[in-house]
Amino acid sequence: MPAAPAPLGDSTLVLIDCQNTYTRGVMELEGVDAALDEVAALLDRARSAGVPVIHIQHNGGAGSPYDIDAEIGAIVDRVAPREGEPVVVKSYPNAFVQTDLDDRLKAVGASNLVLAGFMTHMCVNSTARGGFNLGYAPTVVAGATAARALPGTDGQPVPAAAM
């Protein structure tokens, strides 16, 4: 693994679960608006540089907070896919499990991945590790992710920023 992250121009941008469910209600994440600002800026830079972009969308099924056929499960408008940008629908935290993400990355000659999205400690982390296990060099853009506080072993919450 390289000592430093690859430049965006030598990478493929993978946006993970940038869905409306994380912007409101029971699934709303701490710092989500600032993270989405960073995701949008990163996406603009990638598009301007001609970097391949792949969107990931979690499908939890009808009626769930991840219902991709409902507004709550849709990708946030300001970072929504443009024509030609594929969307990989997943059912597990690791976006490589039972999807065609690996095939799509191979098709664009990807070796370096720049990852952003939600939630940092779940799907972003799982996808980064899954990609590494398949030989990719993942870089997570911390400012373009968000999480929630989690219960700690001592009964005190672990802050979202620590994720």
Each predicted region: which residue ranges?
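Short beta-strand segments at enzyme active-site cores
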Residues: 15, 52-58, 141
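A generic "binding-loop/recognition-motif" signal
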Residues: 18, 59, 120
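Flexible, glycine-rich phosphate/dinucleotide-binding loops
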Residues: 22, 62, 147
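A short alpha/beta connector and helix-capping loop motif
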Residues: 27-55
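Glycine-rich, small/polar surface segments that engage phosphate groups of diverse ligands
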Residues: 56-64, 71-72
